[in-house]
A protein has these predicted regions:
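A short, exposed loop/beta-hairpin motif centered on an aromatic-Gly-Thr core
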Residues: 22-31
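Short aromatic-glycine-(Arg/Gly/Cys) micro-motifs in beta-strand/loop hairpins
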Residues: 6-19
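Hydrophobic alpha-helix-in-membranes signature
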Residues: 19-21, 65
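Short, charged, surface-exposed hinge/linker loops at domain edges
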Residues: 1-3, 32, 36-73
Length: 73
């Protein structure tokens, strides 16, 4: 699965977001700073979502396995 980053130049620098991941957005003074901030935002969102899911399933009989979405892309 590939994610799409969108960057928009604004008067103070750049804003960036990920089309496929609501809530993954950021700001930076430069494009490179914005790219790095966006990578960090995505990592934090995924880590947080995993931790929340694990805590909700704590003690439950669940099956956890890797998922390769959309034909292995």
């Amino acid at each position: 699965m590939k994610l799409t980053a969108i960057y928009k130049r604004v008067s103070e620098g750049y804003v960036g977001f990920v089309e496929e991941l609501p809530g993954a957005n950021t700001f930076g003074s430069t494009l490179e700073e914005t790219r790095e901030n966006l990578r960090e935002a995505v990592e934090l969102i995924l880590e947080t979502n995993r931790a929340l899911a694990e805590s909700e399933m704590d003690g439950a009989d669940v099956i956890r396995e890797p998922l390769v979405p959309f034909g292995g892309e």
